[in-house]
């Protein structure tokens, strides 16, 4: 947390500024000898200045660290630098000293660092000639430091710089010894290794041992050299975009390193084999490795005196100061060293660990190094400064300075991140660094952050969102925190992440909504980067900033974007077009922030890690609020957030408000955050779809393709459940992340946060796509990946359970009850998109085949999909989903009939593919644009929603089969409108909690104002349903209306609300019950899932529209939006698959709504399900009228539904299931394990109607029909109250699938 403070101090810090203000002002004279000229770097530990040595009149590097910082790294730097004097490749030490205010080291000034030089190359790579010759020099420097008994432990490109003088410009110097450690004892023997050592170094280049927190040895420095050289030659590493230490460690451990050699000289196999054979005690054969370089050069005829690549370019790279070097300080220790905010390095005080053992005699005392003071020159500036005696140590000043610079840059953020990173490395819940909210988001400067453990990246996202509420700087720093969603997505312990829960106030800030949305994006793209405050990231900010501008900035004010100028030491690993990155980021960022951090974290750093971390627990995180965040049994290790969160903001689901998403829904106390998280999930699918459409956007064409295609494919196929559960948190930042990655890697300690970003970047990275393609595939976008993950989950279970399976298993059980599904959970949340719904109608078919859509809905549980900025989110995702859904409507008939039809990988894929290709792509583009627009306006918040809502919207629009009808127009004329539609649907699903509450809410929502209202409250209600806080949702919704203008289509809020409120009451219980019951329900859930998957999907479509507008439509039982969806979901739920198919076949045909009105009325009382998110108010009012009649028209509704959707009986049956759901929400509540999910499911079912409702003409009637159908069940619902509860409990257990299945059981 203190780490965060560092970033908070000054956003400029990110750019390399000081932790706070620069420690030294310009023209300040240190020790009467060194006059500060300018700051050239800054890190977590301190700052690096270019200074003029008044004695020698030469420019030197001055590294300064505050004397107040807990981590004092300069001591180690001085100790090692002094020991290395006289060695080649080591800066000349000039002096050191300290005073009351700061410690400093003066050394020779060097030129540009290698990370900067590589990034400056056209392709981001060095030729083999340059790579091999640099390799030789770096190897010599490594051998030199080892020869004096020290390990560098942070070997990376930014810690090596070329000389800047004519005599040294071709020599490579080793910098930054702050992380060094003495591996020998006083007798020169190798010290015994510690059992557990804190992680040191930079994630990207760290050895597997370092990732495992094992004692690092000499071979670990060589592993880092190996990774460096591969990166030099290839331009990137497979894990380049992944910032999460745990994930990268898992990838490295499993990765076939020989794959890295395909572009390297054949001799490198000897290098790899040798270092792989070494252990801690074994001395490396430096000569063997040197011979590898030399032989490779001979083979290629490379001369030692050839020009280096940057020399050929005619650049004066070498002559520029080592400012770029600062990124080196991104290493973890540097962060710790910076000591900003009492950050302690990862397990074990790095500084202490390094210096206490070895440097007992080392002091920065002026006397020790006192150089001749210029006579007559009184010490200027430093009050105590006078006694800073420059140490005319001599030749090493440069190294010190450079390291200092790097560290300083890094340390700025590092201060805050190190502790978090440490926690993360320890596997302890790491406070998710909140996404730094865009400046526009009004956040209290520094809200007391409640760090709660977040099980999933999404939860982190929520936390990020919450953080976003905190000041931008804070947000940034938090984002930087390893706990940040992106981090979480990457981290192997997503569930354990701590989510920062800034107070309710943060969440409530209405302005936050847009800010949150943007923040989320920023968090997604920047959050991981916020660590960028660290040197590397800071410098890299130029690159990732560009991306940020595209994705994040457009979403939120320029100020929001952290100007992390960590030295772009290594972050801009890939020189990919920034715009693509930006767009990708947009897509990804918008998705999770987790995606910043997360929505499903989305931010998943790597597919691999995700698979590794398929722990459902993370998904549950999102419900930190009082939902059963911990509901997810899979994340028992991490503290259940539910309790924690419930206190601070019971309604806010950690998952829902992942990071920025929560922020987005600031207005809705908890839901705003939810909205953000939702946005994350939505973005994910959207990104994937979009990626399908535009591979160019994906940095890693392969990976992206895998993700995009994989996403839909996964959604359809759902082969990897575990992956899906993995956190999608880091997804958002892939594009940016490349650069960021490099920087972040350099800021290891703080970088862990960045690691997530890097992970995200990696996801986009082609390398990742190739090497980690499968693993990363699901994580193509941070959000996307998360969604995919969820989708995968749902895909895996697709045939049987869209998301239910994975959700159920991974976190479905616990999470289902929790509405707080994270983006990852989103897939689990797919439950919200009732499979039954998907099955029911064409929409159902669409949904089923569109696991993505389902995933979106699932990913962003309705609560998660709070549609505060639903329309924004929806816009982006909805198009994608809706197009998919639209395309899929036909399959839905069969799918619904089959129950798995849509879900079936083959069928689903086919359906999805077609939609993706045409409607989906079209919609995706439209949605993307609107999504981006929305995102820019309130996009971040909507992004999470987008994920979930997008899916729903897709359902909504697609189910109608006329995306253009409602969905396309909405995105076109009003990105928000489309999003709103989608969002509303989703929200209505999520929001339809308590029947009583819903009606009023629905009424409000139904009003012209309704869409916005629905949107606003939707997040809350969505969250509520999950949390079983229907009541809360209602208020939230009302509060949110202003912030949630995006959905114009009235949503069936009542549906969701009804489920939600009862859910709300039982949220905790259900959560826990769910956890207890997850396995029990698994079998049933599987069956129900299969049957209900379509329902769920349909429901998700409807749900999305319901969510936002459900409240208003709830009353009105929007016949419009949910007509198709509702009928589809209703029939699916109630009817056998055949019936569903029949219903689906007819579901597209609009039916008269007049008869339904009475039913709606009844329905509202019985169970307001926000039947539809009617595109127009007219429909809404119509629905409202119907709603009052609710139950009475139940029969009518059934026949209509039968006619439109399929057999009357099927409709009636569906209605029944739907009705049971509404009561079921409460029932669901009773059934703790599945209450939330069931709520979601219920809402989703009802959402189905909203989905259709979104469809203009047909949907209304259908929605009405469905709604009526539900009202029919409404009486039953009341009757089913108990039974419904049971069913709902089951559904909750099935996580929405259960809902669908329950509906089916009811029907059956």
From Swiss-Prot:
EC numbers: 2.7.11.1
Alphabetized UniProt keyword annotations: ATP-binding, Cytoplasm, Kinase, Nucleotide-binding, Phosphoprotein, Serine/threonine-protein kinase, Transferase
The keyword Acyltransferase is annotated on this UniProt entry: no
Catalytic activity: L-seryl-[protein] + ATP = O-phospho-L-seryl-[protein] + ADP + H(+); L-threonyl-[protein] + ATP = O-phospho-L-threonyl-[protein] + ADP + H(+)
Keyword Cytoplasm: yes
Subcellular location: Cytoplasm
Annotated Low complexity bias: 638-647, 1097-1107
InterPro entries recorded: CK1_Ser-Thr_kinase, Kinase-like_dom_sf, Prot_kinase_dom, Protein_kinase_ATP_BS, TTBK1_STKc
Residues found modified as Phosphoserine: 441, 541
Record GO biological process: learning or memory; negative regulation of gene expression; peptidyl-serine phosphorylation; peptidyl-threonine phosphorylation; peptidyl-tyrosine phosphorylation; positive regulation of gene expression; positive regulation of microglial cell activation; positive regulation of protein polymerization
Region (Disordered): 364-397, 418-448, 474-671, 720-899, 985-1085, 1097-1308
All residue ranges annotated as the Protein kinase domain in the record: 34-297
Residue ranges with Basic and acidic residues bias: 541-555, 574-589, 786-795
Cofactor note: Divalent metal cations. Mg(2+) or, to a lesser extent, Mn(2+), but not Ca(2+) or Zn(2+).
Enzyme class: transferase
GO function terms (MF aspect): ATP binding; protein serine kinase activity; protein serine/threonine kinase activity; protein tyrosine kinase activity; tau protein binding
Tissue spec. comment: Expressed in the brain. Strong expression in the cortical layers, the CA1 layers of the hippocampus and the granular layer of the cerebellum. Also expressed in the large cortical pyramidal cells in the temporal cortex, the CA1 pyramidal neurons and the cerebellum granular neurons.
Source superkingdom: Eukaryota
Binding site for ATP: 40-48, 63
Cross-referenced SUPFAM superfamilies: Protein kinase-like (PK-like)
Pfam families: Pkinase
PANTHER family: CASEIN KINASE-RELATED
Protein family per UniProt: Belongs to the protein kinase superfamily. CK1 Ser/Thr protein kinase family.
Summary of the function given for this chain in its UniProt record: Serine/threonine kinase which is able to phosphorylate TAU on serine, threonine and tyrosine residues. Induces aggregation of TAU.
Name listed for the protein in its UniProt record: Tau-tubulin kinase 1
Origin organism lineage: Eukaryota, Metazoa, Chordata, Craniata, Vertebrata
